[in-house]
Curated annotation (Swiss-Prot):
Membrane topology value: Multi-pass membrane protein
Protein name per the record: Oxaloacetate decarboxylase beta chain
The UniProt record lists the keyword Membrane: yes
Gene name of the encoded protein: oadB
Pfam family, one: OAD_beta
Keyword Transport among UniProt keywords: yes
Enzyme class, UniProt record, top EC level: translocase
The entry's keywords: Cell membrane, Ion transport, Membrane, Sodium, Sodium transport, Translocase, Transmembrane, Transmembrane helix, Transport
Catalytic activity, as annotated: oxaloacetate + 2 Na(+)(in) + H(+) = pyruvate + 2 Na(+)(out) + CO2
GO annotation, biological process: sodium ion transport
Family in the record: Belongs to the GcdB/MmdB/OadB family.
EC number: 7.2.4.2
Amino acid sequence: MESLNALIQGLGLMHLGAGQAIMLLVSLLLLWLAIAKKFEPLLLLPIGFGGLLSNIPEAGLALTALESLLAHRDPAQLAVIAAKLHCAPDVHAIKAALALALPSVQGQMESLAVDMGYSAGVLAIFYKVAIGSGIAPLVIFMGVGAMTDFGPLLANPRTLLLGAAAQFGIFATVLGALTLNYFGIISFTLPQAAAIGIIGGADGPTAIYLSGKLAPELLGAIAVAAYSYMALVPLIQPPIMKALTTDKERKIRMVQLRTVSKREKILFPAVLLLLVALLLPDAAPLLGMFCFGNLMRESGVVERLSDTVQNALINIVTIFLGLSVGAKLVADKFLQPQTLGILVLGVIAFCVGTAAGVLMAKLMNVFSRHKINPLIGSAGVSAVPMAARVSNKVGLEADGQNFLLMHAMGPNVAGVIGSAIAAGVMLKYVLAM
């Protein structure tokens, strides 16, 4: 009878908390969105499955060695950790002390937990290697660079301004997060506000990279918000685009793009990297990988490498990136008031970025002889190529013969560059404070 009772008590179901149950449902929702609705399935499917694995009771797949020790709640072991941190031998007190401790001290406590016989779960290891090191988003950016054609941007350099204007959503959201904190509605630190703001760039890898550096505790919510809203671009953007433009403006036909030479395409990534990195070194990792991937594509001499980066490598890294993000979908980190704030601020960021791009195009038309269709301004958010397709679709609704796709790809690509630069600005000034 005792053995039967022990068997029942050992069932994971007996240890399932309300928070874990909610997160399992959230993870199933992400899987449904990925499979049934095809919302960014390449990321939401592994993120959702990672969330399932992270919330299995007693499995500890997303826990570090130290977190496993704290979950085990052995009084003698807690006393050893507490003595090192000079706090009470209580789980909550130890967690509070760890939150304030230097990274070196946190590393020492992790090593101490390993010495006591604990080990990190597989998802925690994935997270440390893929996101903790920053390597996975950078490799993704290399792949994106290899798939990007700078031709439309080089053919119409003015569209760079549209990509820059759309980044206003990032900085507006940072101010929004700090405003919520100022009025005591939801608590956000400056690094957290900066990490949330990058959602407005509509660039998943950049959002994950910056969150991993500035606010890893919010990474799960930020990544889910970023990719969910990227999938919802066809629903979010058109009402804003139509509200800010007249029917006449939506029918503007732009001049045919010129042919961009091979030399221009080869020189551009190198020149872009040097110009930006010499002024803003913190943007060099993201922009460097992006430009390197593009140079492999345009040079024409490393087709095997370019093909590998565009396909096999980016697909492999995407799997581990998604599972690593899923490791952060644990109840005690995701089910917080901050998550609601992130979801609200995220959609505001998209709306502000879209509006800023459209309004910049209208402003440019005041001073320009060759008119720009304001609809392509919304493509300044770097959801490539979805935002450009939305611009083209809304344009065709106004004029069935007005094809804007290639024109919209200019600001769309510029948005990728802009989000990387914005991330560099955040890193430089937030980490320096």
